[in-house]
Design a protein with these regions (language model features):
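Conserved anion-binding
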Residues: 105-177
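Catalytic alpha/beta core domains of metabolic enzymes, predominantly
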Residues: 147-230
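Hydrophobic faces of well-ordered beta-strands that scaffold small-molecule active sites
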Residues: 24-30, 53-57, 77-83, 100-102, ...
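Glycine-rich, proline-tolerant flexible connector loops at the mouths of alpha/beta enzymes
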Residues: 31, 36, 49-75, 104-112, ...
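N-terminal amphipathic alpha-helix/helix-capping segment at the start of soluble metabolic enzymes
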Residues: 1-29, 128-130
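Active-site mouth loops of central-metabolism enzymes
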Residues: 13, 20-39, 58-60, 77-85, ...
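Short, acidic/polar
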Residues: 35-46, 85-91, 164, 221-228
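Alpha-helix-loop-beta-strand connector modules within alpha/beta enzyme cores
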Residues: 62-83, 119-132, 196-205
């Protein structure tokens, strides 16, 4: 199928390169307790065999991060990690993954005395030192409060869009270009709208598409297809 695509820049994530006309990469995630190394490795191998180019692993604590090192050694897969609320875990996980995802809204919760710009510069530095790409992962349920309060309660898209654009601008400013962006909502119509608006503003940035809290089949499949096929 010949899909119309924006002329985005190339972003290397481990052995995979996205954007710039490269094949669309598929990412899945494990549903195991990360500290159960055997089960997590088994699931990563199964996902890779099924066609996943990247696999996201949950890391919510330092113990998870320690398990990640062994998981990476055993599988050799292109791993991605979501930092959740503790962005400082980046320096622990970065040596073992191909991509780090951070949520701009979650940066607000940890070390509140620091400006978000300082935190992003730290993340970009860690990523660069460890040959990692990054994903700026904006989510409707956890938008930066400073952005959210600027808009009406019924407008969930504008604060997400502003947040993503601001983070892209900062990463551009400091010269970190190995990043993609995701803008997710549980409503596929909102996903379509916010991603189209972002792509119009930043056609150079590769998109990571997804529907948050999509749910189990068949509902999850239906929501995802609606969002992806527009």
């Amino acid at each position: 199928m010949d899909l119309p695509r924006n002329p985005t820049r190339a972003v290397r994530i481990g052995s995979v390169t996205i954007g710039d006309g490269n094949p669309i990469a598929v990412q899945s995630m494990t549903a195991t307790h990360t500290q159960n190394v055997d089960a997590t490795c088994e699931q990563i191998r199964a996902l890779t065999a099924a066609g996943a180019d990247l696999v996201r692993v949950a890391v919510d604590s330092r113990k998870d991060a320690e398990a990640l090192a062994e998981i990476s050694r055993r599988t050799g897969a292109n791993l991605s990690v979501d930092l959740q609320e503790n962005y400082r875990l980046a320096e622990v996980v970065a040596p073992h993954v191909a991509k780090i995802r951070y949520n701009p809204g979650h940066l607000y919760h940890h070390e509140r005395s620091k400006r978000w710009q300082e935190k992003v510069k730290y993340l970009a530095g860690v990523a660069a030192e460890n040959d990692c790409a990054m994903r700026v992962g904006v989510n409707c349920g956890s938008v930066d409060p400073a952005k959210k309060e600027k808009y009406d309660d019924d407008d969930s898209i504008s604060p997400m869009l502003e947040s993503a654009l601001d983070h892209c601008a900062l990463l551009d400013e400091i010269g970190f270009t190995r990043f993609c962006v995701s803008l997710k909502d549980s409503d596929p119509r909102q996903v379509i709208d916010v991603n189209q608006r972002f792509a119009a503003e930043r056609p150079d940035v590769p998109l990571h598409l997804g529907v948050t809290e999509a749910g189990m089949p068949p509902d999850g499949i239906i929501k995802t297809r609606i969002a992806f096929e527009q």
